[in-house]
């Protein structure tokens, strides 16, 4: 059993410390542990080139054209049974470096895409994606903030797990925590998070969420896109559509059972999404052949060029 701790904070700061606290607990449970600091790595932004999708869907493996430390980090993550992220909270949510990793995960690491790509490779004799991508894994997120501006963090984090369909064990926010290293109660909670993921990693198939219950009964998110003229709502994490209810002063979110197959963190939902994208891409490719499209694009291209600094 191997647990990887990933800190998104500065060297020897609160996030490093709390990530290591969780790893200490995991080690006590018998886990092999490893620690990585994101700021030590060269991680480039995803450019949206979709070369990864092209390689997946043509039996050429799972490739990214960017040359940096991402594949090194990805290899560490794929080798682990469980992962702990400890991130600072910036602008109410997860920091940009973590969000960049999240962007680099999708669609390259999407479970649905890799299931389809594996079948394509088997049928054509091509190169299949790394089989570790289809391996179940558990993950926990720790967010450390200096105030109560923290309301986006849990959703930002869980979307990273959504892509490869990893099981979220804890997704915890610690507001007002600039002094967390000497806060015994919070340190104890971090230690518990480490123990929880080590336990979950020993039996991933039966592992369950151990955090505080959220509003969405499926993914525990508290973030929703609301319809101002009705009770209709969409969960910002799993994408399930339903209705917000208030009973005895408490908020709940209810949805028809058949909507569950559309959830973005389920394989059925991912395959539905892949089919939707396939259709829109086909339409786009046809449009790009038209003279009208080519002329419009040329007009925009010639209107103005991007200003860049002198190097």
Please tell me what each predicted stretch does.
Residues 1-86, 90-102, 106-107, 198-311:
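N-terminal beta1-alpha1-beta2 submodule of the flavodoxin-like/Rossmannoid cofactor-binding fold
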Residues 129, 135-160, 165, 174-218, ...:
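Catalytic cores of enzyme domains
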Residues 36, 94, 112, 171-172:
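Residue-level detector of family-conserved "landmark" positions at structurally sensitive sites
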Residues 62-159:
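Helix-loop-strand module that forms the ligand-binding subsite of alpha/beta enzymes
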Residues 32-35, 165-175:
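Short beta-strand elements in bilobed, periplasmic/extracellular small-molecule ligand-binding domains
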